[in-house]
Design a protein with these regions (language model features):
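Rhodanese-like catalytic fold shared by cysteine-dependent sulfurtransferases
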Residues: 1-17, 21, 29-63, 68-122
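Active-site flanking residues adjacent to catalytic metal/cofactor-binding acidic residues
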Residues: 24
Length: 122
């Protein structure tokens, strides 16, 4: 079953509404470390190993994004979340498309971390 993908325009609209989706920044190490920005309110989740979702709420939609225009990493994470019963999708075009559209961003200093064990990839 293909992983649902959400457009940057639809995600922007949903983030402006109350109860918008939870964003997961799942960029690989190098692209993440060489960037100074992220999507607003995103949690950092290392996209390696087995996904531990114990700290991720099941009552929210989740959108994973990466820096790959083909959403390879974010699709893998979203597929695993769906397998575990979450409502998850991948951002079409990743953060690159988001930045190209000049949509809102935050500096990584504002990055909120997921709890160390719950919600992290091991």
């Amino acid at each position: 079953m293909p992983v649902p993908r959400i457009s940057k325009e639809e995600l922007k609209q949903r983030l402006e509404m109350s109860g918008g989706p939870l964003l997961l920044d799942v960029r690989l190490k190098y692209p993440y470390e060489h960037s100074t920005v992220k999507l607003p309110g995103a949690l950092r989740l290392l996209p390696q190993g087995q996904l531990d979702t114990s700290g991720i709420p099941k009552d929210r939609d989740i959108v994973a994004y990466d820096s790959d225009p083909d959403e390879l990493v974010s699709s893998r994470v979203a597929a695993e979340l769906i397998r575990q019963g979450y409502r998850a999708s991948a951002l079409k075009g990743g953060i690159v498309e988001w930045l190209t559209a000049n949509f809102p961003i935050e500096t990584k200093e504002a990055l909120r971390s997921a709890p160390p064990a719950p919600g992290s990839l091991k």
